[in-house]
């Protein structure tokens, strides 16, 4: 194998290791779970695959539907967003108990690689 081929192979291996170390955070689980129907939760917990950079991560809660109202406009829900007990989690704590309806959680997660990853999911309060 020529020196050039060895250098290219070594460079490729180094880059592969570097890129695998820069994994983006993924939402691993949530409470309540996506598409679930639950009693009004006191908090919503989001659990990610990586430690979060709190300063740049966050979430918001929106009520997207209310029983008996066919044309309910989305309404932001007043809530506090805080780091979870685990550095890979965050919690959303609504200021008031959630009334029956459908809700969307929009989240933004940033880990040590500094790339923001966003997503959302819905759940229903019975």
From Swiss-Prot:
Residues reported to bind Cu(+): 63, 66, 69, 72, 75
Compartments, record wording: Periplasm
Signal peptide segment: 1-23
Any GO CC annotation of this UniProt entry: plasma membrane
Keywords tagged on the record: Copper, Metal-binding, Periplasm, Plasmid, Signal
Example GO biological process: response to copper ion
InterPro entries, alphabetized: CopC-like, CopC/D, CopC_dom, Cu-Rt/internalin_Ig-like, Ig_E-set
Gene Ontology MF, one: copper ion binding
Annotated positions binding Cu(2+): 24, 115
Ranges that cross the membrane: none
Gene3D superfamilies in UniProt: 2.60.40.1220
Primary location: periplasm
Pfam families: CopC
UniProt free text on domains: Contains two copper binding sites, separated by 30 angstroms, which can be occupied either one at a time or simultaneously. One is specific for Cu(I), while the other is specific for Cu(II).
Family the UniProt entry places it in: Belongs to the CopC family.
Note: Significant differences in the properties of PcoC and P.syringae CopC were initially reported. The differences were attributed to the presence of an additional N-terminal alanine residue in the initially expressed PcoC protein.
Description of how the protein assembles with itself and partners: Monomer-dimer equilibrium in solution for the apo protein. Dimerization is significantly enhanced upon binding of copper(I).
NCBIfam families, alphabetized: copper_CopC
Biological role: Copper-binding protein involved in copper resistance.
Protein name: Copper resistance protein C
Gene giving rise to this polypeptide: pcoC
């Amino acid at each position: 194998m020529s020196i050039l081929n060895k250098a290219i192979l070594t460079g490729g291996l180094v880059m592969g290791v570097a890129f695998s170390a820069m994994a983006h955070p993924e939402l691993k689980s949530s409470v309540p779970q996506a598409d679930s129907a639950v009693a009004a939760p006191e908090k919503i917990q989001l659990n990610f695959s990586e430690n979060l950079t709190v300063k740049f991560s966050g979430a918001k809660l929106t009520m997207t539907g209310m029983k008996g109202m066919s044309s309910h406009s989305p309404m932001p829900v007043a809530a506090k967003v805080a780091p979870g007990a685990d550095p890979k989690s965050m919690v959303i704590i609504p200021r008031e108990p959630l009334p029956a309806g459908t809700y969307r959680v929009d989240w933004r997660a940033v880990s040590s690689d500094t790339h923001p990853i966003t997503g959302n999911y819905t759940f229903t309060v019975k």
